[in-house]
UniProtKB/Swiss-Prot annotation:
Name the UniProt record assigns to this protein: Aspartate 1-decarboxylase
Active site: S25 (schiff-base intermediate with substrate), Y58 (proton donor)
Annotated GO MF terms: aspartate 1-decarboxylase activity
EC class name: lyase
InterPro entries referenced in this protein's UniProt entry, alphabetically: Asp_de-COase-like_dom_sf, Asp_decarbox
Cofactor-binding details, from the entry: Binds 1 pyruvoyl group covalently per subunit.
Gene: panD
Similarity comment text for this entry: Belongs to the PanD family.
Cellular component terms (Gene Ontology): cytosol
Quaternary structure annotation from Swiss-Prot or TrEMBL: Heterooctamer of four alpha and four beta subunits.
Length: 119
C-alpha cells in the first residue's frame, strides 16, 4: 500500500508580489526551494492563512536571496501582498518507507528568511 505523506513545507511564507498577467504558477526564492527540497515545476499545495483559500499550482524559481513569494496568473486572485501562506508538497511512500519518512519543514520569518529548518 502507498501512503501520501508530507514531503516538504514552507511555513508562513509571506506573499511579496502578485502578477495577474504572468502565465501561472508561484515564484519562490531559489534558496527556499533548495532548503525545503521543493523542485522547480513540482506540484505544490498552497494554503492561505489569512483568507482560508486553498489551491494547487507548481513552483518556479525566483531570484536567490530575494525572499520572493509571488502569486502568478489566476493564483494572484488567491491572496494579497502580506498574506501568510503554507506551501506543501507530498510524496508517496510504501509501507516499508513510511515509518522512516521525515518531511523537510522550513519555518520562515515575515521577510521570508529562514527562521528554522526542522527535519
Amino acid at each position: 500500500m502507498l501512503h501520501q505523506m508530507m514531503k516538504a513545507k514552507l511555513h508562513r511564507a509571506t506573499i511579496s508580489a502578485a502578477d495577474l498577467n504572468y502565465e501561472g504558477s508561484l515564484t519562490i526564492d531559489t534558496d527556499l526551494l533548495k532548503a525545503s527540497g521543493i523542485r522547480p515545476y513540482e506540484r505544490i499545495y498552497v494554503y492561505n492563512v489569512n483568507n482560508g483559500e486553498r489551491f494547487e499550482t507548481y513552483a518556479i524559481e525566483g531570484e536567490a536571496g530575494s525572499g520572493a513569494i509571488q502569486l502568478n496568473g489566476a493564483a494572484a486572485r488567491k491572496g494579497m501582498i502580506g498574506d501568510f501562506l503554507i506551501i506543501v508538497t507530498y510524496a508517496l511512500c510504501s509501507d516499508d518507507e513510511v515509518d522512516e519518512h521525515r518531511p523537510n519543514v522550513v519555518l520562515l520569518n515575515p521577510d521570508n528568511t529562514i527562521k528554522e529548518i526542522v527535519k
